[in-house]
Amino acid sequence: MKKILAIAMMLAATAAYAQQEIRLYDGVAPGSEGVQDNERVQRGPDGRITQISGVVTPSVTVFLPEESKATGTAVILCAGGGLMAHSWGSDVINMASWLNERGIAAIGLKYRTRVMGGQRPAMGGTGMRLSATVTEFDKIKNANASPDQSGADDENTLNAVNDALRAMEIVREHAGEWHIDPAKIGYLGFSAGGGVGLGAIVKSDAQHMPAFMATIYGPSLIDMTVPENAPKLFIATRGDHHNVAAGLVSLYFVWKQAGANAEMHLYDDGTGPFGPDDVGNTSGTWRESFYRWLTFNGF
């Protein structure tokens, strides 16, 4: 009986939160040939997914608002997890529900993560490691706050970036069906997921360029080149988040120096990640600030 109830809870949770999952590629994802699929999913007591790791087969999960509420805006959610896992429960499921309540479509991107056990070649490099406080943001060149400062782009990062580009293609292909305005699609990334979205901007052509980019304590993991048609940028982080705050201050300056639109929220209430449940801290208001920023900019 307990087993039946557990299965029923899982099915109910899936029906309520995951409307549709679409694989990004037909067959093996480019760059993952020969890599063993070892995906692992963790669930909470209510059956909802909390974390996903070992992702080799990337996909998007579509969360749509009620049609009567739809604003036409869509947010591609890039979860954090250090490129080793996805914090799917907090960064995708919870965030998607919050966005849907406001008429915004949410697309959870399950990009490829680092596969453990030596199944992928390690990146080369000099072993140089980044260490910067927020006042040392000038240490960071081209807004690249990758922990490895060898100058070589990480294969795992580039695979995830390519998945983000493919996700943008899919959302635009289905825009009419999902009641989405193709000109109102952007990325929202947390931690490493912010780096994935920012990397997609660097690699984007006109077809893939988002209308906006929001990064929550997630600096760039590759050299930033701000395009002429740069999307509007929203940044939120804690000022004492080592390396991260410095990387995001550097990103803000790079964006503004290029003449692009950027807004930054630098909170003085802690040293690491934060969420909407931090009600006693100023950083707990970031979602409301993000939503106001979206509406102010016509999204």
Region locations from a protein language model:
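C-terminal catalytic histidine-bearing segment of alpha/beta-hydrolase fold enzymes
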Residues: 258-299
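Primarily recognizes the serine-hydrolase "nucleophile elbow" in alpha/beta-hydrolase
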Residues: 154-230
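Alpha/beta-hydrolase active-site loop
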Residues: 122-176, 288-289
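Short amphipathic alpha-helix adjacent to the substrate-entry channel of hydrolases
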Residues: 89-108, 253
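Short beta-strand element of the alpha/beta-hydrolase
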Residues: 71-80
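Active-site glycine-rich loops that stabilize anionic/oxyanionic intermediates
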Residues: 79-84, 239-241
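The feature captures the conserved acid-bearing segment of alpha/beta-hydrolase catalytic domains
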Residues: 206-267
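N-terminal cap/lid segment of alpha/beta-hydrolase-fold proteins
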Residues: 19-69, 101
